[in-house]
Amino acid sequence: MLSRLGFALIVAVFPASALANDTMAQLGVGGLTFLTNDKIEMASEDLSISAEQVKVVYEFKNNSDADQRVLVAFPLPDITGSGDFMVSVPTEDPENIFGFETTFNGKPVEATLHQYVFSVGIDQTEYLKSLGIPLTPYGNDTIEKLNALPDEDKQELMHRGLVIPMEYDAGQGWQTDMTPVWTLKSTYSWEANFKAGALAEVIHTYKPSVGGTVGVSFLAEPYEDYDPATSYKKDYCTDDAFINAVKKTLKDKNDPYSAPFTESWISYIWSTGNNWSGPIGRFHLTVDKGSPENLISFCGTDVKKTGPTTFEMTATDFFPPYDRELEILILNRQQPE
């Protein structure tokens, strides 16, 4: 059973109406995915998460008397464009937006990137490539190349559900942008050779997508069939101690948005990696909240504070939960101006 862990964080003062416009969604990313292999066990996993980096150190054991060649993949979250694209993209590299790096037994892995574009369930990858359009459904480069296309191509893109026209006035009269609304699916893959009866170490690092909002939103009253307190309790296990710590910082006890914090959200997808033999022999998690003044809350079992900013949990014979991902809430303390 997951226990609840609550620690304190921080926020700036903004009215409720501002929160929707100052919110950045996060992209949930996980670890490596292996083609199912019942000969290989995960002897240990050491997972470290902060707003700057996710690092996973795996130790695998090939329990068979033969080498095992395994297809390994790192699936990226789907990215769907929209007229008000507000998603945290960690880097500007369209072919490695998470700054993904992996080593296998100390040697860098050369992974192959697979990218596909879908709209209304139809693969439109080759069509976009034929027009010279980047596959990323966001960014100035993509929009500029879409806008430069002949009208007949723009009409065909709209017909296929790949773009929508967005009109705006930036002070130079009305303009129309072709805005991408397709979905980009991306996965890295490579082949790994696990020697018979031997241990293998895989180290995997990337920059997380950190979402957030400019104020603390979970103290607000329920609205439009949404209860912030219940939602945060379910996702982040925000307990009474955590809530009370935030309430103590309110500048105005009658204003739930007056706590001196901003929110950061990090999602780690760990339910996709259960493709090895048996449980994880030893699992160790370290989460760093960034600053000693920040507050943090996430769901874990027997979590201990081990430093000014770090919280850790250790488990043996661990199965990642199938019914939930690791959702981390960090409240970033804002200093008075």
What is each stretch, according to the model?
Residues 13-15:
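N-terminal signal peptide c-region/cleavage motif recognized by signal peptidases
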Residues 19-337:
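Lumenal/extracellular ectodomains and adaptor appendage modules
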Residues 1-7:
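Bacterial N-terminal signal peptides that target proteins for export
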